[in-house]
C-alpha cells in the first residue's frame, strides 16, 4: 500500500525520515520542474537549479507546513517564490531571453509540432497569464489553489487564465494559417 503525502509528511516531521522526504521529492519533482520550465521559458538548467532550491527550502521549512492546502500547493508556492527571487536577482522578471526557448518533445504527444507551437505560444504570454495558465491548465490546480500559490485574488487568477487561454487560441490559430 502506497503512503499518502500526509503520511510521508508525518514521517518527515515526527521522525526526520529522509527517505520519506525523498519519496515526496520523487512524486512532486516532475510537476515542479514543469512549472519552473514554463516560468523560465524552457531553460532546462535554470529550471533544474530552481527545482533543487525549491526542495531544499521545502525540507528546511517542512515544519512550517500547516496543512491548510495540499502539499503540492505549498510546494508550488515555494517554487514560485524561488523563481521570483532568481528573476529579481537577474532583473528578468518581465523579459527572459527568447532565444533560450527550447521545444520539449513528449513521446506521448501525438503531434510534437503542436507541442512546440503551444510552448512557443505560452512563452509569448505575459508572465502573470503564463503562470496562471500553467498552474491551472497544465498542472491541474484549481483556481483557488493557484490563487494561494500566487498570493493573488481568486478573480485575478480566473481573469489571467481566461485571457491567457484566449491569447493562446488566437496565436495558435494564426500560426495554423
Where in this protein do the model-derived segments appear?
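Short helix-capping/turn signature of helix-turn-helix
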Residues: 27-30, 38-40, 134-141, 151
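Arg/Lys-rich amphipathic alpha helix in sigma70-family domain 2
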Residues: 60-67, 77-97, 163
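Structural recognition of an alpha-helix C-terminal capping motif at a helix-to-coil junction
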Residues: 49-56, 69-81
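Short, charged helix-capping/linker segments at alpha-helix termini
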Residues: 13-23, 34-53, 176-177
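Short, Lys/Arg-enriched C-terminal cap helix and immediately downstream tail that follows
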Residues: 88, 165-177
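Helix-turn-helix DNA-binding module
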Residues: 120-131, 139-156, 167
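Internal acidic/polar
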Residues: 2-7, 85, 91-115, 120
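Sigma70-family region 2
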Residues: 13-14, 40-42, 53-70, 89-91, ...
Amino acid at each position: 500500500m502506497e503512503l499518502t503525502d500526509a503520511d510521508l509528511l508525518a514521517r518527515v516531521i515526527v521522525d526526520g525520515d529522509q527517505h520519506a522526504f525523498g519519496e515526496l521529492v520523487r512524486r512532486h519533482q516532475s510537476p515542479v520542474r514543469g512549472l519552473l520550465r514554463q516560468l523560465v521559458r524552457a531553460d532546462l538548467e535554470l529550471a533544474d537549479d530552481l527545482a533543487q532550491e525549491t526542495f531544499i527550502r521545502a525540507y528546511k521549512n517542512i515544519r512550517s507546513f500547516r496543512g491548510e492546502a495540499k502539499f503540492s500547493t505549498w510546494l508550488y508556492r515555494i517554487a514560485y517564490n524561488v523563481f521570483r527571487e532568481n528573476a529579481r536577482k537577474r532583473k528578468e522578471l518581465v523579459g527572459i531571453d527568447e532565444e533560450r526557448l527550447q521545444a520539449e518533445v513528449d513521446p506521448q504527444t501525438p503531434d510534437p509540432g503542436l507541442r512546440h507551437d503551444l510552448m512557443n505560444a505560452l512563452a509569448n504570454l505575459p508572465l502573470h497569464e503564463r503562470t496562471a495558465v500553467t498552474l491551472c491548465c497544465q498542472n491541474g490546480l484549481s483556481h483557488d489553489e493557484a490563487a494561494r500559490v500566487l498570493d493573488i485574488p481568486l478573480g485575478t487568477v480566473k481573469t489571467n487564465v481566461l485571457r491567457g487561454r484566449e491569447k493562446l487560441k488566437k496565436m495558435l490559430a494564426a500560426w495554423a494559417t
